Amino acid sequence: MAQARILVVDDDTSIRSFVEMALDSVGYAVSTAGNGVQALEVTHQVHPDLILLDMRMPVMDGWTFARTYRQQAGPHAPIVVITAATDAGERAAEIQADGYLGKPFDLDELLGLVSRYTTAS
């Protein structure tokens, strides 16, 4: 069975690296991007199975990325918002995200969430 491909989109290098290492250590194929423009480029190359998306980023924010990504042809990966905003649920609903996780987050919580969206039913 092929590895699930996860795209981590966050302008915070330390968070991106932490999530990448954590997911890589349990067998996921991880790609990263520091903003929405980079993320759109990666989606054309990698076709992720799940996108973990920060909302507040320079160049192109999470809202614009999500809208642009969903307007593209082809199958779309679930999007899970990862944000420090206290209204994480509302942020996720604004872009019709499939789920959300508040920062700071627990590693087990992150791994459980990723597993839920990448495990075939």
Predicted regions and their residues:
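Charged docking surfaces used in two-component/phosphorelay signaling
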Residues: 17-25
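Acidic, metal-coordinating helix/loop segments flanking the phosphotransfer/catalytic sites
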Residues: 32-50
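Receiver (REC) domain active-site loop signature in two-component systems and cognate sites
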Residues: 57
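Alpha4 helix (beta4-alpha4-beta5 surface) of REC/receiver domains from two-component response regulators
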Residues: 64, 86-101, 112
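Hydrophobic/aromatic residues positioned on beta-strands within the core alpha/beta folds
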Residues: 80-83
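C-terminal output helix
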Residues: 105-115
